[in-house]
């Protein structure tokens, strides 16, 4: 189990409560009942149906409802000041597990841990550092740099112009930094002369950086107009906008977090692959551990990452290109290759 530092930051994200309670006619479940297993989720920036990060994590919670019989609810935060209040809403109601989605909720999650020692907290994308762990808080983290590296290698090998791009949310969020810089490193690893244009949406607040599809689209189109022929969109709805810009202009796109061939069908014609974090199984696995009494004692749980299938563009990917991507992926698994990307943007 790898352990890292939890960087903390305040950020804007959610407050609409939607509940999936007991079956119709039985009334709302009592989560204080020891025989009822309840899981609550507090989202990061964006909505629960963002076709990306929040949605994929929620699907892991829903899997626990289906397979484990858990009672599940979520809260969409609308103001960063409400992080603690939203977490407390679930904890005070007797929820067994609380999933907080995104780097920005890390500080509030760590603060809630000691206040509610009987609750198991899963902090998605919230890295925990040695010496700063809380026993009932586990960070679900992923090797985004490796996934981004694979995406960059593929993009560089597929590019005819020798120019590739990436449209990202803010690089102040370490996983976004690792995706973007991993993409750059992977491209240069397989094609040192490739031109890589990465734009981070650092010019707005955290309430906007991941929820700005228009900016994402116009930024991608601007790149394309300058010769970029593969674009990696990494930043929630902002990144989704970049995918749509690629579809409009007829150039290849790479999605993020989930297999966006399914979550952004409007961009299917352009989607080469997606740099995935397997959020759904990672979330479900930790919930199941909590239910079975095998929840980790603080620290981090490292989920899997990799590329999605090529889907409609599979015929365009030469066998030698796919072989090189697979070779790199295997080298990561064997531990014989490192990305060289720092865990977070250097100060």
Q: What is each of the regions a protein language model found here?
A:
Residues 10-14:
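Hydrophobic helical h-region of N-terminal Sec-dependent signal peptides
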């Amino acid at each position: 189990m790898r352990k890292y530092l939890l960087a903390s930051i305040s950020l804007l994200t959610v407050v609409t409560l939607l509940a999936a309670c007991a079956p119709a006619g039985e009334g709302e479940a009592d989560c204080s009942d020891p025989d009822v297993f309840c899981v609550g989720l507090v989202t990061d920036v964006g909505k629960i149906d963002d076709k990306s990060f929040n949605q994929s994590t929620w699907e892991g919670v829903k899997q626990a409802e289906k397979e484990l019989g858990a009672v599940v609810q979520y809260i969409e935060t609308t103001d960063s000041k409400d992080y603690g209040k939203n977490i407390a809403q679930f904890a005070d109601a007797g929820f067994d597990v609380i999933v907080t989605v995104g780097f920005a909720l890390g500080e509030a999650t760590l603060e809630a841990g000691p206040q509610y020692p009987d609750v198991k907290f899963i902090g998605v994308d919230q890295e925990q550092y040695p010496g700063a762990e809380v026993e009932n808080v586990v960070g679900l983290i992923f090797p985004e740099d490796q996934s981004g590296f694979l995406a960059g290698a593929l993009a560089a090998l597929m590019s005819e112009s020798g120019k590739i791009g990436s449209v990202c949310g803010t690089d102040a969020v370490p996983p976004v930094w690792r995706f973007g810089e991993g993409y750059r490193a992977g491209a240069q690893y397989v094609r040192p002369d490739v031109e890589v244009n990465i734009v981070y949406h650092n010019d707005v607040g955290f309430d906007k950086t991941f929820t700005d599809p228009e900016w994402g689209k116009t930024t991608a189109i601007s790149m394309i107009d300058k010769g970029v022929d593969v674009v990696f969109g990494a930043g929630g709805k902002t990144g989704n906008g970049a995918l749509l810009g690629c579809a409009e202009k007829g150039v290849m796109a790479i999605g993020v977090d989930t297999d966006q061939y399914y979550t952004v069908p409007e961009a299917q014609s352009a989607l080469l692959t997606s740099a995935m974090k397997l959020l759904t199984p990672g979330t479900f696995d930790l919930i199941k551990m909590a239910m079975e009494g095998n929840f980790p004692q603080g620290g981090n749980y490292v989920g899997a990452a990799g590329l999605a299938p090529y889907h409609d563009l599979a015929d365009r990917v030469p066998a030698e290109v796919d072989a090189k991507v697979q070779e790199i992926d295997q080298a990561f698994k064997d531990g014989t290759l490192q990305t060289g990307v720092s865990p977070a943007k250097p100060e």
